[in-house]
Amino acid sequence: MLANKSVPASAPEHICHLTNPCLWNGKTSPKLYVVVAGLIVNGATEDQIVLPFGLRNLSMESNGSVLVNGLCVPEKDLIRTLESDPFVYDDMDEDGSFACVELKELCDIAADEEDCRNLLTEYVLQNAYHPSILCWKLPEDHADFAALLRELDSTRPVLF
């Protein structure tokens, strides 16, 4: 256990610092950490969430190459997937796979622009902790939502 801290429910956020964390590095080292957050009332746990996550540095070269912790991810290793159940990404996180999530179907089922915005927001926030997701991909006819995705998740590139 790296840390065990209690903070009041009124605290808007809590920051925990890790010293020399092991980076999630794809198949080489798919190291995951776990955050357990609970709501304790009068000493009894009323609600709890267990959230595995990985730490990694992600960047993109001017030629379009994706780098994880400074190493190029070969195009053949990047799995293009339509939006999936979070359990799919859990498995990818654990086995060190790399994903580019195509959001086309999510955009297609939206009733209107506001619905699309809401669906994209929910999906990105729900899956932003997965280190296996390296990028989001929007259909070209929904490129105007790129700014929203970048605002929600500034750590990943948005592709078209």
Walk through the language-model features, giving the residues of each:
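Secreted/periplasmic carbohydrate-active enzymes, especially glycoside hydrolases
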Residues: M1-V101, E114-F160
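Short gly/pro/ser/thr-enriched loop/turn and capping motifs at secondary-structure boundaries
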Residues: L106-A110
